[in-house]
Amino acid sequence: MISFFNDYIDKKNYYNFNNCWNIDAPLEQSWNELLNYKKWPAWCDALEKIEPLGQFDHLKKGNHIQSIWKGTFPYSVSFDAIIKDIIPYSFLSFNVTGDLRGEGICHFLGSNESTMINFIWNVFPTKLWMRMCSSFARPLFIENHDLIIEQAVTGFIRMIEHKNSL
């Protein structure tokens, strides 16, 4: 009976997000800026904290980072991400554990002038209150995610535009 209940709760708490961003910057620049995780707080207001578990400057396979994110609504999520696979200028995937459990996948497609980034985020919340509130709070969780992504993309684009105007 408990297994059935857990399966039901898991299905109600599965979130699949698929976001596509078009960046007016060359693929190489977009890739390098996005992998420079230490600079994320400068352009991503929703990122409260990010720190490596180990010594590294740019993300590569096996790296482990901890982060805390807070959107518009009065809660934050903390999770660890471990880089699972990386193909330079093309693909990045990672697993997350903590307040969220799941995976993120980024595909990059670009040219000398622009970059398309497709970000897939498949996660389950692990916080009990989030799991129990899913039947009525799901739209708020989705909206919060969308607002965080919108702000992050806007901040990333502004940062790229500023660097390219210098």
Which residues does each PLM region occupy?
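Hydrophobic beta-strand positions in extracellular immunoglobulin-like domains
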Residues: 23, 69, 121-123
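Hydrophobic pocket/interface hotspot
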Residues: 30-34, 40, 65, 83, ...
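Beta-strand/loop substructures that line and gate deep hydrophobic ligand-binding cavities in soluble
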Residues: 96-150
